[in-house]
């Protein structure tokens, strides 16, 4: 069964169509109007080996908040739907990713229990037309809409771009790990019998 899904969401603030193929090869086609965010989503797809298409139009004349958060909502919904009943997936994933002087850890659990721990000092307030505080909002939106327990921690680093880039790469790698199928797992990876 294909593990892919497409979601469309239209509000008074944004109009988004997103599709993801969990078993892809890292191809992406991203257009949100927020250049730095597009770059980060491309990195997430490439390093997670997901095929990801995102078309978003938002109220960027105000700021990037609605666009970034709503893409996170839709990405979370697409991940959840693409995984279906989560049969035979490894469930847990983690990744340490260095980017020059920065080192980031992402650990996650596809538990169905949404939670975010985000621990990072982002010294630069804006990269391109994106406020760096929106990175946490994005991860929160993904986690809560996909049902992921997600921990994102910058262990150290001084360059905000490097820290955030390492976060998106590590998130892709950790999610790839957690979504991999393992033939040894019968049903789901839980003694409860469901996730």
Swiss-Prot record:
One GO BP: L-histidine biosynthetic process
Pfam families associated with the record: IGPD
PROSITE patterns cross-referenced by the UniProt entry: IGP_DEHYDRATASE_1, IGP_DEHYDRATASE_2
Gene3D superfamilies: Imidazole glycerol phosphate dehydratase, domain 1
Xref: CDD domains: IGPD
UniProt keyword Ion transport present: no
NCBIfam families noted in UniProt: PRK00951.1-2, PRK00951.1-5, PRK00951.2-1, PRK00951.2-2, PRK00951.2-4, PRK00951.2-5, PRK00951.2-6
Source species of the chain: Acetivibrio thermocellus (strain ATCC 27405 / DSM 1237 / JCM 9322 / NBRC 103400 / NCIMB 10682 / NRRL B-4536 / VPI 7372) (Clostridium thermocellum)
EC number of the protein: 4.2.1.19
Gene Ontology CC annotations of this record: cytoplasm
Enzyme class, UniProt record, top EC level: lyase
Protein name in the entry: Imidazoleglycerol-phosphate dehydratase
Substrates-to-products reaction catalysed: D-erythro-1-(imidazol-4-yl)glycerol 3-phosphate = 3-(imidazol-4-yl)-2-oxopropyl phosphate + H2O
Domain of life of the native organism: Bacteria
A molecular-function term among this protein's GO annotations: imidazoleglycerol-phosphate dehydratase activity
Keywords of the record: Amino-acid biosynthesis, Cytoplasm, Histidine biosynthesis, Lyase
Metabolic or biological pathway, per its Swiss-Prot or TrEMBL entry: Amino-acid biosynthesis; L-histidine biosynthesis; L-histidine from 5-phospho-alpha-D-ribose 1-diphosphate: step 6/9
């Amino acid at each position: 069964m294909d593990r892919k899904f497409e979601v469309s969401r239209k509000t008074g603030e944004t109009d988004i169509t997103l599709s993801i193929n969990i078993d892809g090869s890292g191809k992406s086609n991203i257009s949100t109007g927020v250049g730095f965010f597009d770059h980060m989503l491309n990195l997430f797809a490439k390093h997670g080996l997901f095929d990801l298409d995102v078309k978003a139009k938002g109220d960027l004349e105000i700021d990037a908040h609605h666009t970034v958060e709503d893409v996170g909502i839709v990405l979370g919904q697409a991940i959840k739907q693409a995984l279906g009943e989560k049969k035979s997936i490894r469930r847990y994933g983690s990744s340490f990713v260095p980017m020059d002087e920065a080192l980031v850890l992402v650990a996650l659990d596809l538990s169905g229990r949404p939670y975010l721990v985000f621990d990072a000092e982002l010294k630069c307030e804006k990269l391109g037309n994106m406020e760096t505080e929106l990175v946490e909002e994005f991860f929160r939106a993904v986690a809560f809409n996909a049902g992921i327990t997600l921990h994102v921690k910058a262990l150290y680093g001084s360059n905000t771009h490097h820290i955030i880039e390492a976060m998106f790469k590590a998130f892709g790698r950790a999610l790839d790990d957690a979504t991999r199928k393992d033939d040894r797992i019968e049903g789901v990876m839980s003694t409860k019998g469901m996730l």
